[in-house]
């Protein structure tokens, strides 16, 4: 079997992209494959021994995706390449990760790319991957994002490696509802001053063009291609594992999910499928735009006994100046309104509305930053204590 290596935290969550890729390789290209999630605290000697034994009688092709910037995984790929493996890098950021930053050759402080670790890079969804692509060193294959994606997932193909290989029982999955983010369609120009500790050195401000949020890889990698057909979303949900007669919790991948949530819950119920929990990763402005509808939505969720977890809301900062630097498209007043809405609704939907850290949420907050002067820190702290 081909091994597809990824980063993994060790928690019982699936990895949609990598697991869908392994499923595609097996079901469409007849290349048996599994995903091996490597935990941060692992035994390198044991891993190399496992890889050597696994590939003893088969073609030495190893794939990598979702590496989360881990240098130890880059080095693993480099070592395998030196040992005669064909190493393949896949995923939404494969192009930039493989090539490096623009003008990196003349600017040594820029990211130089991962050509020394990988023979082949495949950018984008797996649909257009062909067996020949795995045989041409130096190739960068780019697959466009469209709504016609391969979305079959064998949720049982994920294993973990720490000291040895062990199968992971996935208890949290992902379901794709939209490709990219509508905010990514918006171009912005951010005027950035020099970092706080360099302000007295005569360094001028600089302008940076951004698509969507200035730090967001989704904006550059995917842009926005709209919602998937509902039938394709339902097929993904129907394919999820079950626990105690209900589908396991899943993240609904959609930066603006609230518009779809009510109709989706109703459609799933009509198909005789019982849900347990839906996790949302969304923007502040989506919550504010639908604040008057959330009560009815949560009543519907409560009727079907489905918990709604706002797992990650992109606050990023509680200072207006920083929000403008990040091209967030929101203000501190917007954030306060969002939080007040959730606090008010929590009084009614105690068990079915979840958004606190002790309920599993982990909201976006970027700090420290190079611009954290006294004025900004005071504004952030004042907002936090509201």
Regions found by a protein language model. Give the residues of each.
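Conserved SAM/AdoMet-binding glycine-rich loop
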Residues: 1-6, 88, 226, 230-372
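Glycine-rich beta-alpha loop elements in corrinoid/cobalamin-binding modules
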Residues: 32-147
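Alpha-helix termini
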Residues: 29, 50-57, 104-113, 186-189, ...
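Flexible, low-complexity linker/hinge segments
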Residues: 155-170
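Residue-level recognition of beta-strand->loop/alpha-helix junctions
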Residues: 29, 35-40, 217-220, 365-367
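Canonical Radical SAM [4Fe-4S] cluster-binding loop centered on the CxxxCxxC motif
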Residues: 166-230
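A short, flexible N-terminal coil/short beta segment enriched in small residues
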Residues: 1-29
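Catalytic cores of alpha/beta
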Residues: 370-385
């Amino acid at each position: 079997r081909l091994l597809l290596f990824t980063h993994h935290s060790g928690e019982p969550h699936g990895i949609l992209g990598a697991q869908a890729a392994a499923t595609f390789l097996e079901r469409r290209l007849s290349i048996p494959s599994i995903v091996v999630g490597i935990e941060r605290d692992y035994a390198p000697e044991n891993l190399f021994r496992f890889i050597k034994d696994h590939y003893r009688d088969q073609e030495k092709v190893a794939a990598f995706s979702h590496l989360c910037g881990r240098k130890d995984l880059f080095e693993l790929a480099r070592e395998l390449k030196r040992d005669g493996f064909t190493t393949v890098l896949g995923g939404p950021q494969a192009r930039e990760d493989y090539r490096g930053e623009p003008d990196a050759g003349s600017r040594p402080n820029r990211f130089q790319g991962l050509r020394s670790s990988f023979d082949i890079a495949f950018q984008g969804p797996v649909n257009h991957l062909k067996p020949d692509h795995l045989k041409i060193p130096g190739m960068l294959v780019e697959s466009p994002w469209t709504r016609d994606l391969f979305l079959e997932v064998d949720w049982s193909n994920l294993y973990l490696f720490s000291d040895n290989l062990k199968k992971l029982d996935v208890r949290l999955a992902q379901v794709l509802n939209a490709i990219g983010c509508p905010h990514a369609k918006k171009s912005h120009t951010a005027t950035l001053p020099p970092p706080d500790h360099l302000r007295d050195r005569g360094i001028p401000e600089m302008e940076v063009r951004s698509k969507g949020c200035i730090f967001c890889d989704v904006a550059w990698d995917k842009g926005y291609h709209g919602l998937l057909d509902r039938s394709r979303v339902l097929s993904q949900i129907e394919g999820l594992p079950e626990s105690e007669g209900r589908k396991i919790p899943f993240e609904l991948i959609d930066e603006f999910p609230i518009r779809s949530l009510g109709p989706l819950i109703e459609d799933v119920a009509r198909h005789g499928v019982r849900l347990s929990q839906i996790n949302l990763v969304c923007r502040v402005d989506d919550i504010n735009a639908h604040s008057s509808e959330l009560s009815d939505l949560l009543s519907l969720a409560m009727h079907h006994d489905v918990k709604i977890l706002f797992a990650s809301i992109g606050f990023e900062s509680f200072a207006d100046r920083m929000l403008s630097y990040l091209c967030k498209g929101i203000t501190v007043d917007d954030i306060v309104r969002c939080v007040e809405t959730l606090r008010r609704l929590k009084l009614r939907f105690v068990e079915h509305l979840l958004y606190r850290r002790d309920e599993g949420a982990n909201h976006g907050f970027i700090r420290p930053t190079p611009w954290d002067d006294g004025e900004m820190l005071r504004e952030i702290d004042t907002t936090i204590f509201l």
